[in-house]
Structure formats: structure tokens, C-alpha cells
Swiss-Prot record:
Catalytic activity: glycerol + ATP = sn-glycerol 3-phosphate + ADP + H(+)
Residues bound to sn-glycerol 3-phosphate: T14, R84, E85, Y136, D246
Residues binding glycerol: R84, E85, Y136, D246, Q247
UniProt-listed GO biological process terms: glycerol catabolic process; glycerol metabolic process; glycerol-3-phosphate metabolic process
Record carries keyword Repressor: no
Family to which the UniProt record says this protein belongs: Belongs to the FGGY kinase family.
Single annotated GO MF: glycerol kinase activity
Activity: how regulated: Activity of this regulatory enzyme is affected by several metabolites. Allosterically and non-competitively inhibited by fructose 1,6-bisphosphate (FBP) and unphosphorylated phosphocarrier protein EIIA-Glc (III-Glc), an integral component of the bacterial phosphotransferase (PTS) system.
Name this protein carries in UniProt: Glycerol kinase
Source organism of this protein record: Salmonella paratyphi B (strain ATCC BAA-1250 / SPB7)
Alphabetical list of Pfam families matching this protein: FGGY_C, FGGY_N
Amino acid sequence: MTEKKYIVALDQGTTSSRAVVMDHDANIVSVSQREFEQIYPKPGWVEHDPMEIWASQSSTLVEVLAKADISSDQIAAIGITNQRETAIVWERETGKPIYNAIVWQCRRTADICEQLKRDGLEDYIRDNTGLVVDPYFSGTKVKWILDHVEGSRERAKRGELLFGTVDTWLIWKMTQGRVHVTDYTNASRTMLFNIHDLDWDDKMLDVLDIPRAMLPQVRKSSEVYGQTNIGGKGGTRIPIAGIAGDQQAALFGQLCVKEGMAKNTYGTGCFMLMNTGEKAVKSENGLLTTIACGPSGEVNYALEGAVFMAGASIQWLRDEMKLISDAFDSEYFATKVKDTNGVYVVPAFTGLGAPYWDPYARGAIFGLTRGVNSNHIIRATLESIAYQTRDVLEAMQADSGIRLHALRVDGGAVANNFLMQFQSDILGTRVERPEVREVTALGAAYLAGLAVGYWQNLDELQEKAVIEREFRPGIETTERNYRYSGWKKAVKRAMAWEEHDK
């Protein structure tokens, strides 16, 4: 029998699908990536073609094996991680979607959400699903599809239509329609799942008029769900053995599996998650309560805060403001000045996320004086990412009663040493940057590998986790508090801006 040398992680993201091959030491052997089309039918609406998601993801799986000259019988298992909340409805018989995937960023269901609030359901939804009422989550998207595609609700009741988040859709396609499952982490993002009973919530299904017959079975994040024989030479059936939504996969990839451990992912936005162990902590500070992966893929809970604009604000400096020609240049210009000269940038281009949840806030620059130049604005924009992270961390510490000792970081912007040092300064906490930056894929690989015995336990994984660089706070507490109070003042003035125009 051929030795099972590798694990494959499929990382299905918002703008691209990736496949990553890892070896036993958690080194990356090969990567393949394909972008796919973003569809914007109306302002604020975002869709993907589910068939294109599948085509891009399945082709990266074939490519990544061919690139590294690996046959499928050398693969121990496949793990899947995915953009969360994005909703797909398809025909059980044909596997054809009845509508495009409605993406997590899509705001078309704002009216449905307003109605849920008017019906007094906010507390019920927060208490039982852990979520706030927002178009972000899958439930209202599924309702919208059933409301707008003729005859679909009746077909769903008859069991002819299926719903799934992206993980469910991929596994359905990979198993030729034999397996209709999701995991606890993805289910916890639908607004249809009771995170305490660990089952679909009948009241929410009733409120949104979504038939139970169309929902997938919910399973642990680390177990064998089915087999696939797609990809590579040899045509061996490979077990699909791990699933986690992208942010929960990153939390697991960073090995934040104990209560009180936290990670922040710096992508287009920032996603910060803190593991709260076996207790679901209800947030009083605008955070989400969500399901995370425990040491062997079982249910743990986490607090989550999302910042909408992180890397996106650096793109704004480059694309709209033309202050830099490359995102990497931001660090160089930021370090050409000793501080921001009193300037604060609040990048609330699409409102503010956690812990404010103000859709009417708008971007603003405060503290401008005649001596301010472009370097000060670049520096203040980078600093805004760290300030927003502190906002979320303060809320997490208040909710959980846990004082964070170190923040593990990942995502594109962590390559920026200035930002990481300022993050440590403004938090007053160690910031740990890992050697392997692909922590989302790593999390999916770990979950799959543990399920099939490729890795024995977490201790074995801990030995492989290398911190490439640790940043420690370099400013005094009084200075830290002074700077942060300026940020709070700036945010307050940027809030509720849009309403004045209406």
C-alpha cells in the first residue's frame, strides 16, 4: 500500500478557491489558486455562480496534485474550509442551483432583518443562535431565494431542493450527491441553528418559513463524512475528514484550543475570535457568540468580533487616494514620521462592525492641521486597524472576564512589522506571528489529519507550531491610554453620519 504522505486542504474563499498540500511536519508542499467572478446585480447585492465555485475549487485540487507530482493514493485525507454564511439552494435530483449563491457581504435582506426586529425577535435570535440580526447570516438569504424563485418553497417542502453553505455544496459535488452535511461551525453562522441544543431551531425555521427537509445533517468538525475520487492520478477514494468555516479554521490552525486563547486575522476586514471553552458566553458588548473547534473537533464556543475595514483601508490609500503604489509601501511611509501628528483616520466606509454595529457611520479624518502630510495619513490609516482590534478585544475581555496574554495573528497584513508592533503597543499585549501564514488551510488540514490518525493528537501539532516573531509592547500605559482615548473620540464623531442626510 502506498504511504499516505500528505493532507490536502481546500480553502474556498470569497474571491478565490485554493488547494494546499501539506506534509507531516505541516510544511506547505504545493499551492494552487483560481479566482472567480464577483457578481453585483444591484448596489449592495453580491452573488457568486455556485457552478463556478465548484469548477474553480475542483480544478485547483487536480492542479495542486499535478504540480507536485503527487498521486491521490498518497493523500491521507481532505479538509475543507470556506467563506461562511454564503447561501446556496440546489435541486437534489440534478445538482443544479436554482439561483446564484447569495454571498455573506450581500445586503439585499436588510428589509427582512428590519421586520425580524419589529417582530421583537432580536433577543430570541441572540440568545439561541448567538448572532445579531443582520443580512450577513444565511437564514434571511435562504428565505429570499424561496420567496423569489417561483414554486421553490413547495419543492423544498417535498424534499426536492437542498440548502447548504459552501462547505455543504462542495461535499455534495465531491461525493456525487451522496453526502449532504455541514459542521457545527458553519451551521452556527446560519441564524437557523440553536448553538445550545446543537440542532436546527424550529422557531427560526418557522419564522423564516424554511422547510427542515432542505437542511443538511450537522456533524463534528473532525470526522470522515464521505469519500471522493476526484483529482490526480490513480483515482483512489480519499476521505473528506475535516470541515470548518474560515475563521474557526484559522483559530484551530493557530492552535487556540484552550479557553482564553485568541487570534486575529487581518484580511480585507479583521476577524478576531477568542475560544471560551465549553461555555457559550453571551455578549453584552456587540460581539457574536459562535461555535469553535475543541481539541478533537468537538464543540467549543468562541466570541467573535468583525472589523469591516482592515486591508481594505490600505487598498483605499493605494487605489482611490493614490498615496502609495503598493500595499507593502505603507510600512515604509508610516515609519518616515515619528507619529501621526494628531491625526486619526476612521475607515468606516461601509459603517462600523463590532462592537459598534453602526451602519450609518462613515469614514472620516480628524485632527488635520497645516503640518500634516501624506505620511501622517498613511500612518494613521495603519493605526486605525490596530485601534479597531483593541475595540474588539476590550469587548471580549468585558464579556468573558478573561485577560488576554498573547494575541496570535495571521492574514496578509501581518507582514507589516510597523502594524504588528503598533498592535502590541496599543493592546499592551504580546503579538505572536507564526512561521506558517496559511493558518486557515492549516486548520482544515489539522482537523482532517486528526480524524484519520495522520496526526495523533494536539501535542504533536504543538511541536510543529513555530512562532516566527513575537512583538512586545514598547510604550507606557499613560501614552497608550492617551492615544486610545483620541481614537474613541474620533469614532464617536464618525458615527450616525448618514442619518443626518436622510
